[in-house]
C-alpha cells in the first residue's frame, strides 16, 4: 500500500505542476475563487498534496475550501461562508450538468488533511 501511495503522490504532484488555474475576480479586481479545468481526470487526486496547498496559499490562505463538481473541474476559494454562498448555486449546477459528476460536497483542505465540511445543497 505504501508503494502505491508514494507513486500516486508523485503522479498527483506532476499533474498539479501542469495546470494553470484561472482566477475569477469580482468587479473591483479581487480574486473570488480559482477554477482548474483539465482533460486529465487525475487532476482531482492532486487536491490533497502540499503542492496544491502551496499553489493557492498566497491568494486564499492556509485553509482552502475545495469543490469538485466533476472529474475535470476543481474550484478553490478561501474558507469564507459569504463567498461560498454567493457561488454555491452555480457550483451545484456544475455538478448537476456534469457528464461525469464527482461530488456536491465542500471540502476543507489544510496542513492537517482533507474533510468534507458541508454540501452545496445546505446552508453554511
Regions found by a protein language model. Give the residues of each.
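A contiguous, surface-oriented mixed alpha/beta subdomain in the mid-to-C-terminal portion of proteins
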Residues: 1-107, 120-121
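Short, low-order "capping/linker" segments at domain edges
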Residues: 114-124
